């Protein structure tokens, strides 16, 4: 239908090295299988699924193996951002692995105060960024508590990214933020081919199709795997409003 795809094998915060190794091998298998099937689907990984909560070096090794496999197939790995307890370590591992920007990119959350500085540093290194609002329940000491401030931060970071000349991803279902990105791109002669929008598979399907018809590049984020229940309950516990968002937009789809 013209959509691009990113696959996310559900799972995070593993406590055993064997679990982290299994997750790494699962991603290598996914990349192998995608190549066999001729599918250019990207993959998204959480570093705590690869052992970050156990040992930073373990996560580095596993991410390096996955990136090497992706490079072999000219594929792409997106490193997800998790709770703020892992933000610095996630950035450190991403930089340590130092995969080329056509092989790996990272996620930045607009609700964190620190994100302006993080984006500035990442852009200097040429990193490809996926911008999200952020879904974890964080204290006001480190994150904007009000939606309007999160949105303002999102727009500010989005403009920095679009102006960089690097291919980035704008991940949101908020039509106002999508429109802001498109308006900024038009005003600054940035082609729709130079960035993409990312949306969850099955959520706001009419919006996804409308964006395609407008000539935008649209990638669907597809979580899958057996760990869905734990993932769902954890997200719900962290931010109950997530459930309302999901239900509201399922009906709007």
Residues covered by each model-derived region:
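Positively charged, amphipathic and often flexible ligand-engagement surfaces
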Residues: 1-253
């Amino acid at each position: 239908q013209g959509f691009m795809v990113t696959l996310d094998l559900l799972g995070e915060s593993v406590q055993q090295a064997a679990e982290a190794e299994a997750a790494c091998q699962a991603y290598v298998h996914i990349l192998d299988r995608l190549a066999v099937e001729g599918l250019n689907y990207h993959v998204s990984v959480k570093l705590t699924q690869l052992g970050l909560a156990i040992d930073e070096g373990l996560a580095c090794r596993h991410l390096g193996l996955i990136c090497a496999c992706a490079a072999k197939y000219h594929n792409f790995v997106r490193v997800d951002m998790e709770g703020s307890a892992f933000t610095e370590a996630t950035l450190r591992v991403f930089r340590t692995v130092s995969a080329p920007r056509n092989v790996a990119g990272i996620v930045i959350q607009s609700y964190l105060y620190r994100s302006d500085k993080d984006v500035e540093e990442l852009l200097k290194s040429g990193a490809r960024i996926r911008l999200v609002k952020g879904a974890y329940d964080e204290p006001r000491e480190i994150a904007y508590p009000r939606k309007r401030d999160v949105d303002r931060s999102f727009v500010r970071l989005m403009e920095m990214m679009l102006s960089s000349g690097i291919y980035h991803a704008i991940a949101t279902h908020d039509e106002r933020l999508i429109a802001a990105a498109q308006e900024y791109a038009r005003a600054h002669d940035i082609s729709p081919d130079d960035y993409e929008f990312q949306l969850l598979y099955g959520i706001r399907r009419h919006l996804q199709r409308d964006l395609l018809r407008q000539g935008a590049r649209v990638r669907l984020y597809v979580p899958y795997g057996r760990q869905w229940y734990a993932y769902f309950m954890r997200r719900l516990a962290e931010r109950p409003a997530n459930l309302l968002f999901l239900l509201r937009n399922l009906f709007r789809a």
